[in-house]
Amino acid sequence: MMKTKYLLLPLLASSSLLSHMAFANNHWPDLPIGVKNGVSAQIGSKVYVGLGSAEKSFYVLDTQAPQNGWTLLAEFIGPERSGATATVVGENIFVFGGSGKASDDASSPIIFDTVYRFDTQTNRWHQVKTQTPVGLLGASSYSPDGKQVLFFGGYSKPLFDKYLADITRTDKKAQPEQWQKIVDDYMGMEPLAYQWNRDVLSFNPTNDKWDVVTRSPYLPNCGSATVIDGPSITLISGEIKPGLRTAEVKTFTYGELQPWQSTYALPAAKGQAQQEGIAGAYSGVVSNTLLVAGGANFHGAKAQFESGQMFAHNGLSKAYNSEIYAKQKGVWQQVGQLPEGLAYGASFSVKGGVLMVGGERADRTASTKVYLVGLNNNQIDIVD
């Protein structure tokens, strides 16, 4: 998944609501092509984005010299994939999992269990001689110590591979009832039946070994926005089963005796009865305030689920949200809106704000836009 690598700073002393927005243009260069459902990473002032809808392309932008634009790097050496997760260790970017076809003539997509390493010093990709122990599609990852990578969530490879194979080989027009039964059976399961990864896994790049650090007390979820503060990671929202999100926000601190901490959940968006939760949102820190923006969900899915409908998003349209939330004094507030609803892009904390890169629009196209969301005198500034 597209992930965030940020320093979580102390919250603002002021509790004033940020309610106004200002817009400025033509500072941040757009992507050469739209990127959604890809991977992202940050090393110093350089931000990296690619894969997903960009196929095998991988780009870098020096945020201290945006006038130089995006540079195309070496082409990814593995099969094209979406929904992978990436983490930096040293000067290397490690890419784990994702979903796609193993070959051009493959009958259906699969969840990949492969790992790749991009050396930013030599501009070269390498396949790592290891295999992920679980499916990491939609997982979140980070390095708590610059030595290892920790993972949260991720789809079940056996279950999702079977679903993709069944739905791909069934002709929807010729066999509509059978096709619909496959969808209903898979989408109608309870959250735990999906067997998403509930363990906090560790990967050591030095010896390519995997380990289980602990187990999450929460329902496993995928597509969370993430914010990193040294050994801690904050996991914001995400989905707990296909089509159903959670508004939960929790923090994991590596090395602590009790590593998990629940925090305030995201509030309901203005005009909505409850917060559906969001997946694929953008997040970061600006002016000592944690921001979360955009993300996708299905308005009404939570109500249907609470009424007993396990196929929670059945009959609902996918919503691409534009709300911006800020966390002040430990409490979330809605403080503004993006120029458009976006999800499944990349976000980075940089000087002046949160840099939002690419993503998926409501018409399902991949965006090339790059926005900087900042704060100025308690006002949301959006620079593109």
From Swiss-Prot:
GO terms for cellular component: periplasmic space. It catalyses: N-acetyl-alpha-neuraminate = N-acetyl-beta-neuraminate. The active site is at residue 239. Gene3D superfamilies: Kelch-type beta propeller (2.120.10.80). The keyword Iron does not apply. Its EC number is 5.1.3.24. Transmembrane segments: none annotated. Keywords: Carbohydrate metabolism, Isomerase, Kelch repeat, Periplasm, Repeat, Signal. It holds the Pfam family NANM. Kelch repeats lie at residues 46-90, 92-145, 147-184, 185-230, 233-281, 303-352, 354-383. One of its GO terms (molecular function) is racemase and epimerase activity, acting on carbohydrates and derivatives. Belongs to the NanM family. NCBIfam families: muta_rot_YjhT, PRK14131.1. Converts alpha-N-acetylneuranimic acid (Neu5Ac) to the beta-anomer, accelerating the equilibrium between the alpha- and beta-anomers. Probably facilitates sialidase-negative bacteria to compete successfully for limited amounts of extracellular Neu5Ac, which is likely taken up in the beta-anomer. In addition, the rapid removal of sialic acid from solution might be advantageous to the bacterium to damp down host responses. HAMAP family: NanM. This is N-acetylneuraminate epimerase.
